Amino acid sequence: MRNPGAQDNVSVSQGMRAMFYMMKPSETAFQTVEEVPDYVKKATPFFIFLILLELVVSWILKGKPSGRLDDILTSMSAGVVSRLPNLFFRSLEVTSYIYIWENYRVCELPWDSPWTWYLTFLGVDFGYYWFHRMAHEINIIWAAHQAHHSSEDYNLSTALRQSVLQQYSSWVFYCPLALFVPPSVFAVHIQFNLLYQFWIHTEVIRTLGPLELVLNTPSHHRVHHGRNRYCIDKNYAGTLIIWDRIFGTFEAENEQVIYGLTHPIGTFEPFKVQFHHLLYIWTTFWATPGFCHKFSVLFKGPGWGPGKPRLGLSEEIPEVTGQEVPFTSSASQFLKIYAVLQFAVMLVFYEETFANTAVLSQVTILLRICFIILTLTSIGFLLDQRPKAAIVETLRCLLFLTLYRFGHLKPLIESLSFAFEIFFSVCIAFWGVRSITHLASGSWKKP
């Protein structure tokens, strides 16, 4: 989306204000896409800071943290996975937009006009509303979007639980703008629209008074994430709630919201979170007789079945009682802290990889991606207490040391090199012993 140095032009103030769409047209006007900063990348430290702040504030106000460690790690893992394709190419939303602009535009609005800026703000938000609505009403698109709804908690980390597949359907809804709005203006607003939706994933903020009439707020979005019957298929807005009010999909928060999918998946494995509904569609597609019914499996709602309305029957949605207990890891507190530590190590190399894509070789980037994916998989296995978790973690630590020795992974602080080697050597020994125990007992063969 931008040249490697573009993000350095974003000040701390701009990085924070971008998260609330509080930017002036004059400070976000760029002639080319290459000049547009990566505002999402710049916001990463703010994400982490605000997640920690929310935990503290929730503890003070409610006497308990706003989320559970296992769920927060799973949400952040999804966020990491969703951005890995950006190491190789622009998002499909921007790439397709540029193609249509260069080949089919009918007119060219001035890139530095405030009127263009505000029109694009409305256009992107309108496009997002319809994408988001279709993501709930078309099963094959829901297969991607459901990952975002899989958390049974509702906090700022939930905003990071993004789908790696979502951009492959969302791009269609922004194409009309490419007929007249310059790509550089679109590239700014597609990021701001996403960033705005971060802070509304919280229970700490209850209501915002008159702003509730116009803006999408935490209260409105809590309804959207609910699995109560009154919450289903409501409040699709990105920034402005007016679209829901206009098109009849608005619902006010009026009773306790129970979060998550109507049928919780009960896992912390990041790739199962991402792809489990695709597997469900695959098996349902082949088990459903008739071409028309197979077509409907893909393009009608997730609740559709033969003889049912397009979006399914509301009475088939499980009733909530308010006594639902979220799926929680049975792992020890020590193991959860270990998972956090390993996630933090991975995150350092993840951020460093994005910051240095221009100088790293393709081989190094690919190997780092393998390490990142294996780390997230292993953390999911550990939290789910899978029998194979010890074996996977042993292999992961061995991979780290191998990549480290060959120079594909290096700590930012050179003096920590020896400490890294010692730490991962101890991990290999610990998990290696547990792996041998599992292999000897045969427990690793269990699902």
Swiss-Prot record:
Enzyme Commission code(s) on record: 1.14.16.5
Coiled coil regions in record: none
Membrane topology (UniProt): Multi-pass membrane protein
Keywords associated with the record: Endoplasmic reticulum, Iron, Lipid metabolism, Membrane, Oxidoreductase, Transmembrane, Transmembrane helix
TM segment ranges: 43-63, 111-131, 170-190, 334-354, 363-383, 413-433
Fatty acid hydroxylase domain segment(s): 118-249
Cofactor requirements of the protein: Fe cation
Catalytic activity: 1-O-(1,2-saturated-alkyl)-sn-glycerol + (6R)-L-erythro-5,6,7,8-tetrahydrobiopterin + O2 = a 1-(1-hydroxyalkyl)-sn-glycerol + (6R)-L-erythro-6,7-dihydrobiopterin + H2O
Class of this enzyme: oxidoreductase
Localization of this protein: Endoplasmic reticulum membrane
Pfam families per the UniProt record, alphabetical: AGMP_C, FA_hydroxylase
Ranges spanned by the short sequence motif Histidine box-2, renumbered to the chain: 145-149
Superkingdom classification of source: Eukaryota
Function: Glyceryl-ether monooxygenase that cleaves the O-alkyl bond of ether lipids. Ether lipids are essential components of brain membranes.
Protein known as: Alkylglycerol monooxygenase
Source species of the chain: Rattus norvegicus (Rat)
Gene: Agmo
